[in-house]
Amino acid sequence: ACVSQEGLPADTVVPDNRNGAAALARHLIELGHRKFAILAGPTDLCAARDRLDGFHSALSSAGIELAYHNVVHGAFTRDGGYESTKRLMATGTDATCLFAVNDVMATGAMAALRDLGLRVPEDLSVAGFDDIPTLRDLTPALTTVRLPLEKMGEEAARLALDGETPDEPRVIPVQGEVIARESTAPPTRS
């Protein structure tokens, strides 16, 4: 059994990126946000696409339209988040909340906003995805989706040891958890 290795001829356990991003979107909507921007990562990365699709799906279900110009693709890195945020802000976005499809991009986004003289969350809420350990060092602390890495490892071990040999490899999605922190707050403007 594998973790996050779809396409191999073996059972695999994967994070449920789509539903995790949808849960995060619902949380942000509950805070009062209606205008969103997304740092969507590279278009050829499955995890980035799933997170974008899940977030967008939850917005659509709530009757919230996502403006095309508020979706910016860039590298899945801190610098990718920084540059994507600078491009986004140069368009004059009216978003009150920025979702970066991974925490590393969110870290770059927060640095870009700081360099532009904007405050998180007072001027723009920021959320990420992954709950990487270095988030403890960010100020303000980042709202994110925590990947259940321990649970994924346990499930992979269970699959490897269960003795079953299915005809087709199984793909087992594991749900993440929204971790609300100080980088998101109700919007101060509509």
Named regions from a protein language model:
Residues 1-190:
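Bacterial carbohydrate/catabolite-sensing allosteric modules
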